[in-house]
Amino acid sequence: MNRLADKIKNKQFVITGELNPPKGIDLESLFKKAEGLKGCVDAINLTDSAGSNMSMAPIAVAKLMEDKGTESILQVTCRDRNRIAIQSELLGASALGISNILCMSGDPPSGGDHPDSKPVFDIDAVQLLNVIDSLNAGSDMSGNKLNESTDLFAGAVVNPGSEDLDKELARMEQKIEAGASFFQSQGIFDVKLFEKFMESANRFNVPVLAGIIVVKSANMARYLNSNLPGVTVPDEIINDLESSKDRVESSVKIAGRIIRDVSSLCSGVHIMAIGWESRIPRIVSEAGLTE
């Protein structure tokens, strides 16, 4: 059973979370966080060395997490592997029972903790989606037949706050034509901007999960404004966080409010709590989404 695919295909509201595999082999903390999200989210993204900072391979974490009853979304980037290695990993994921794949181009290594690492980028996210479409149809990227086809459910990312919205929408359409069945967006703070984006994106009739970044402090908000393209945390939120006597409570209420405001515009939300995963159940409750 693929809960994520079933809910998306049945047009039900979807909630996903995100966890970063560790730098090391101790998974106790990650499993504890995943356990705390059961019944609250439909699936959990496992990042692929996020920000080009080396961490455990997410495919290993996904398998172990699925064995414990938590559905995963395996992030696959094009940064570190050529087309042979990527196809090999996708076959491995399918053999392990990992179905959900989020296709991403990936961040350049220069910004991570191994800045001298050589980037690969043999293919990009659109081509990666095409690869999955081929594997699901029973052949590899070169047209060679597989002894059994995969059954992968592919998604992609989109940035509603892109400076060039027409270009972003064109890229989104390319991803859909290549096989994207759903999208997770970059973090949303400006609801009117997201509404404008969705007015254009709705013509594609492909589900979009609005990205919700849990902002922990005014300083974090300023950092996002300076370093994350397409993300603008408004002064109102920064001022609220700066003057708050209970930073955690304010952060939870802000995230909950944004979810309430965007929930009628999209097919679900993707909550990026960045270390505050234990607060996601409260955020979901604050948003009025608790069953």
What are these regions (language model features)?
Residues V14-S29, S72-I84, L152-K167, L241-K253:
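Active-site mouth loops of central-metabolism enzymes
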Residues E18, I44, A93, K175, ...:
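Conserved, mostly hydrophobic/aromatic
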Residues N2-K7, D26-E28, S52-L64, N82-S88, ...:
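Active-site-adjacent beta->alpha loops and helix N-cap segments on the catalytic face
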Residues C78-L96:
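Glycine-rich anion/phosphate-binding loops
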Residues M1-N20, G24, K32, D140-D151, ...:
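N-terminal amphipathic alpha-helix/helix-capping segment at the start of soluble metabolic enzymes
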Residues I44-M54, V76-T77, C103, S181-D190, ...:
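Catalytic beta/alpha-barrel core
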Residues P119-S139, L146-N147, V157-G161, N205-I254, ...:
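Active-site pocket-lining/capping segments in soluble small-molecule metabolic enzymes
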Residues G24-L37, A57-P58, I84-L90, E163-K175, ...:
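Short, acidic/polar
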